[in-house]
């Protein structure tokens, strides 16, 4: 596959940054689609070119596909903001990119989906993503769909609960997952695209039960593991009730995470970084930030 220029959509996100770095290291011309070029530059995004535009607004994309051979989109919203819905971003924004890619005769469009999407069609986030994948597959363009089991960045909730002293799990805690590091996933994406693969279900090198993941979080904090198992009926009940008692900004991501917690999320093993290393990095980073805070000096007592 002889490609030289890649447009990365979602370039300022967790995975997008790793993809930009991966393709820069491979010597490609990387055009990063960003909402604010100055902010992206200040945040340390190192791409060949920053193209300022919003995928939700097709008028801002004029010229984005010029000379592009490959589009990689990680666009999606896990936590809703700016008044945009999953259908606005996960579906329509990607559809706008696809329309422009087709008009520009881009060779291939790669999209980051989610593992086990077919089992979560009732979840709005997943439904919007799957609708775009269906449109992509129906389009006359070569495509690669990558379905990761979960990102390391999504595992922070386990560490946060452990930090508070107790991790709560639904059911036995024996369901398995193998989340993957962003840099490892970027390598998978580049390899799959180069090989012309259509669909890649992928996860990290280590498959853990939810219990083991919780234990790893406690170990990183040097705390004794305290895990409470809630009856799974609570999780299933929350899936039914949350849409009626919380705004979409709350129940949208909750429905996805609660659904994923109710099944095995194990993709094809790849990579070298383990979750325990990620937890250790997070703990170290928090400690360094705490140490860097200026110390408050206490005024000495007056001598009388």
Show which residues each predicted segment covers.
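N-terminal Rossmann NAD(P)H-binding glycine-rich loop of SDR-like oxidoreductase domains
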Residues: 4-26
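NAD(P)H-binding glycine-rich loop region in Rossmannoid oxidoreductase-like domains
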Residues: 7, 32-96, 100-103, 118
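Non-catalytic, hydrophobic alpha-helical segments
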Residues: 15, 71, 185, 189, ...
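Glycine-/Pro-rich loop/turn segments that contact NAD(P) or position catalytic residues
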Residues: 77-163
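Substrate-positioning beta->alpha
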Residues: 151, 171-192, 198
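Glycine/proline-rich active-site loop of Rossmann-fold NAD(P)-dependent oxidoreductases
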Residues: 153-160, 191-200, 223-225
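Glycine-rich Rossmann NAD(P)(H)-binding loop
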Residues: 170-175, 200-207, 218-222, 230, ...
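A hydrophobic C-terminal alpha-helical subdomain
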Residues: 232-304
């Amino acid at each position: 596959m002889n490609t030289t220029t890649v447009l990365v959509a979602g370039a300022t996100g967790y995975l997008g940054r790793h993809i930009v770095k991966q393709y820069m290291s491979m010597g490609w011309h990387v055009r990063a689609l960003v909402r604010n070029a100055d902010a992206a530059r200040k945040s340390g995004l190192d791409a060949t070119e920053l193209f300022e535009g919003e995928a939700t607004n097709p008028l801002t994309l004029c010229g984005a596909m010029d000379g592009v051979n490959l589009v990689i989109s990680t666009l999606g919203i896990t936590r809703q903001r700016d008044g945009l819905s999953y259908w606005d971003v996960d579906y329509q924004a990607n559809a706008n990119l696809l329309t422009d890619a087709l008009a520009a005769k881009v060779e291939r469009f790669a999209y980051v989906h989610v593992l086990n999407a077919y089992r979560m069609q009732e979840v709005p986030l997943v439904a919007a993503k799957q609708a775009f994948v269906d449109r992509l597959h129906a389009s006359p363009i070569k495509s690669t769909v990558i379905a990761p089991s979960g990102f390391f960045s999504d595992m922070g909730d386990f560490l946060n609960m452990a930090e508070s002293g107790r991790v709560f799990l639904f059911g036995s805690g024996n369901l398995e997952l193998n989340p993957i590091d962003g840099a490892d996933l970027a390598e998978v994406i580049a390899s799959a695209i180069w090989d012309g693969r259509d669909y890649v279900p992928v996860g990290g090198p280590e498959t853990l039960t939810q219990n083991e993941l919780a234990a790893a979080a406690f170990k990183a904090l040097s705390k004794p593991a305290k895990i409470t198992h809630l009856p799974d009926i609570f999780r299933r009940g929350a899936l039914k009730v949350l849409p009626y008692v919380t705004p979409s900004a709350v129940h949208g991501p909750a429905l996805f995470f609660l659904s994923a917690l109710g099944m095995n999320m194990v993709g094809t093993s790849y990579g070298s970084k383990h979750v325990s290393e990620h937890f250790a990095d997070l703990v170290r980073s928090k400690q360094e930030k705490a140490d860097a805070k200026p110390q408050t000096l206490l005024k000495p007592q007056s001598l009388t």
